[in-house]
UniProtKB/Swiss-Prot annotation:
Originating gene: argF
A GO BP entry: citrulline biosynthetic process
EC number: 2.1.3.3
Name of this protein: Ornithine carbamoyltransferase
Binding positions (L-ornithine): N162, D219, S223, M224
Keywords from the UniProt entry: Amino-acid biosynthesis, Arginine biosynthesis, Cytoplasm, Transferase
Functional description taken from the UniProt entry: Reversibly catalyzes the transfer of the carbamoyl group from carbamoyl phosphate (CP) to the N(epsilon) atom of ornithine (ORN) to produce L-citrulline.
Pfam family, one: OTCace
Family annotation (InterPro entries): Asp/Orn_carbamoyltranf_P-bd (IPR006132), Asp/Orn_carbamoylTrfase (IPR006130), Asp/Orn_carbamoylTrfase_sf (IPR036901), Asp_carbamoyltransf_Asp/Orn-bd (IPR006131), Orn/put_carbamltrans (IPR002292), OTCase_ArgI (IPR024904)
């Protein structure tokens, strides 16, 4: 049987994604109820980090432990990858010793090549192009608060970055309408815009983009590696700050999400995270449950499901 990987949301069918989101919600309830479920006893997750993270490391490492497995953290200084070993060689060796691998790195081509030569599932835990694990948590969070996101309106505010690209893929897979409000010069990848033009549109006025939206999402103005552009970006993105008054223009049942960390006073107003329509804390916790569901799905042929 061929190995399944999760490099973008397009690697799973819409039906598989919907089932995974519902399973993640079940796993959250099981965890909160104190139920012990350990299908990964004797299994090992290799975690390759070339970009640092709080939520990604904690959620994967904790999730593997809760499942009864073991996680190994590998930074560039811990592997021969950091010394120039070819990706195909590292992929063959590491995958021969672990059951599943997650990679958080810069170039998306790196995870694609790793998957090409790996004998076990590869999970993209973030690249410069996509952040699909975050979208699993976001879709789970919407499902838990509002039910199905199909045919809803989602508004992305800010940089057309890897999170925006992942929301574009999510619009296609989950069947919602995505509006993107981004400053000129910071629009999403044009190839993705063309690919997903049936469900994604650019809206010039950010207030118009927020009208009747069921979900409003934003991210930092300068992503990791763009710190030198911070001042320039701050000037260009200032009109795109998400505030409670912006949410007032949306649907009465609107939710607000942010993948965190957030910069209060920049992409969001100081009071936005504390607004009752904000679900960022559930969203952050759901990284744990969504990724547990993902790992369970990718290893389902090797474990006993509960």
């Amino acid at each position: 049987m061929s190995v399944r990987h999760f490099l973008t949301l397009l690697d799973l069918s819409p039906a598989e994604l919907e089932a995974l989101i519902k399973r993640a919600s079940e796993l959250r309830k099981m965890q909160h109820a104190g139920e012990v479920y350990q299908p990964f006893v004797g299994r090992t997750l290799g975690m390759i980090f070339e970009k640092s993270s709080t939520r990604t490391r904690i959620s994967f490492e904790t999730g593997m432990g809760q499942f009864g497995g073991h996680a190994i953290f590998l930074s560039p200084k811990d592997t021969q990858l950091g010394r120039g070993e070819p990706i195909e060689d590292s992929a063959r060796v590491i995958s021969s010793m672990v059951d599943i691998i997650m990679i958080r790195t810069f170039e998306h081509e790196k995870v694609e090549k790793f998957a090409q030569y790996s004998s076990v599932p590869i999970i993209n835990a973030l690249t410069d192009d996509f952040h699909p694990c975050q979208l699993l948590a976001d879709m789970q969070t919407f499902y838990e608060h509002r039910g199905s996101i199909k045919d809803k309106i989602v508004t992305w505010v800010g940089d057309g970055n890897n999170m925006c690209s992942s929301f574009m893929a999510a619009a296609n897979q989950f069947g919602f309408e995505l509006r993107v409000a981004a400053p000129y010069g910071f629009e999403p990848n044009p190839e993705l815009m063309e690919k997903f033009k049936h469900c994604v549109s650019l809206v010039d006025d950010v207030q118009d983009a927020a009208k009747d939206a069921h979900l409003i999402v934003t991210d930092v103005w300068a992503s990791m590696g763009q710190e030198s552009e911070q001042n320039t970006r701050a000037r260009r993105f200032a009109p795109y700050q998400v505030t409670p008054s912006m949410l007032d223009k949306a649907d009465p049942e609107v939710l607000f999400m942010h993948c965190l960390p957030a910069h209060r006073g920049e992409e969001i107003s100081h009071d936005m995270l504390d607004d009752p329509r904000s679900v960022v804390w559930d969203e952050a916790e759901n990284r744990l449950h969504a990724q547990k569901a993902l790992m369970e799905f990718l290893l389902k042929d090797k474990i006993k499901l509960n």
